[in-house]
């Protein structure tokens, strides 16, 4: 887990199951008060090894973002999925639509592009107000 100005960067390694997902979610949630206090922010979920997860992982991820607290200042979510990640060619599209209608989100092949997009989303927010979805 990394914190950068206006960003929480979570590095997802190994095979994912409900327990591992819950552990990472709790670690991320522990950072939320600090991030909210600093202003609007975004998350980058960097998938390093695989996208081959059970359907419950996808459903719970969507539910967590949809049910974030009303006071949350989270404004955008980026997923980093490099072409070499297991399942990327077949499952990337799942991430491209995972958060449609929930929060602004996008998928990138590299971390730098994801960081730049998050920064732009936060700048757009400054100019126009919150963006509740894609």
Task: Report residues per predicted region.
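Amphipathic, Lys/Arg-enriched alpha-helical "gate/interface" segment within cytosolic domains
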Residues: 1-134
